[in-house]
């Protein structure tokens, strides 16, 4: 028979979850959507059952979470079997915990360990003006594969770094792949035509 819970909420409930702890319930209790101890917003048909876990289950979940924020299915199944909680509930616990931690990290403006910081190690996007684009387009019409000398000359004319010129040509060739200076095919004309109707 499970022990009675007294005092504070189980550790498995993240502080940012909206479910309120209700003293007097067994530690491992499934609350149904029809349970009148649930808050009004959690009552009603179609709501999932809420799983309150024992301290030992919470400790096991937390220990696993601290080792790996994104455990694989085999790990989750093994953990679920070991602590006697259905695997889908373990999956949801991990999703909720990651979400809660992410919100806390955002509030404290610290980088989230589960994701790469998009600003770190990323070069700022180069803004290319209309006149620079016009110069590059004229050069592209003459030669789609300019050598280093031609790219350096374009860099002097546009004020852009040669490496950006090289990337611009790569991107432009990728956009125009398959046409290679030929007249556009009927298929490409149909694809680029404005929708009718």
Swiss-Prot record:
Expressed in which tissues: Expressed in hepatoma Hep3B cells.
Keywords: DNA-binding, Homeobox, Nucleus, Repeat
Gene3D superfamilies: Homeodomain-like
Residue ranges flagged as DNA-binding region: 46-105, 121-180
Entry GO MF terms: DNA-binding transcription factor activity, RNA polymerase II-specific; RNA polymerase II transcription regulatory region sequence-specific DNA binding
UniProt key word Ion transport: no
An annotated GO cellular component: nucleus
PROSITE patterns: HOMEOBOX_1 (PS00027), HOMEOBOX_2 (PS50071)
Compartment annotation: Nucleus
Keyword Calcium: no
GO biological process, one term: regulation of transcription by RNA polymerase II
Stretch list, region Disordered: 101-127
Family per similarity comment: Belongs to the paired homeobox family.
PANTHER family the record matches: DOUBLE HOMEOBOX PROTEIN 1-RELATED, MIX-TYPE HOMEOBOX GENE 1-RELATED
Note: DUX genes are present in 3.3-kilobase elements, a tandem repeat family scattered in the genome found on the short arms of all acrocentric chromosomes as well as on several other chromosomes. May be functional despite lack of introns and a poly(A) addition signal.
Record-given protein name: Double homeobox protein 5
Organism: Homo sapiens
Gene: DUX5
């Amino acid at each position: 028979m499970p022990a009675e819970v007294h005092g504070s909420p189980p550790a498995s409930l993240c502080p940012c979850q909206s479910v309120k702890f209700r003293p007097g319930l067994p530690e491992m209790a499934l609350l149904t959507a029809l349970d009148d101890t649930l808050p009004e917003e959690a009552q009603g048909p179609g709501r999932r059952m809420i799983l309150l876990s024992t301290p030992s289950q919470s400790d096991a979940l937390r220990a696993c979470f601290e080792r790996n924020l994104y455990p694989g299915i085999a790990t989750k199944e093994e953990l679920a079997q070991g602590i006697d909680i259905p695997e889908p509930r373990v999956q949801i616990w991990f999703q909720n915990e990651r979400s809660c931690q992410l919100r806390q990290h955002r509030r404290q403006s610290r980088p989230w360990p589960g994701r790469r910081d998009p600003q770190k190690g990323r070069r700022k996007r180069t803004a290319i003006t209309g006149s620079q684009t016009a110069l590059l387009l004229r050069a592209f019409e003459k030669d789609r594969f300019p050598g280093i000398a031609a790219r350096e000359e374009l860099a002097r004319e546009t004020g852009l770094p040669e490496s950006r010129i090289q990337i611009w040509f790569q991107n432009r060739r990728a956009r125009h792949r398959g046409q290679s200076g030929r007249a556009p095919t009927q298929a490409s004309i149909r694809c680029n035509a404005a929708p009718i109707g």
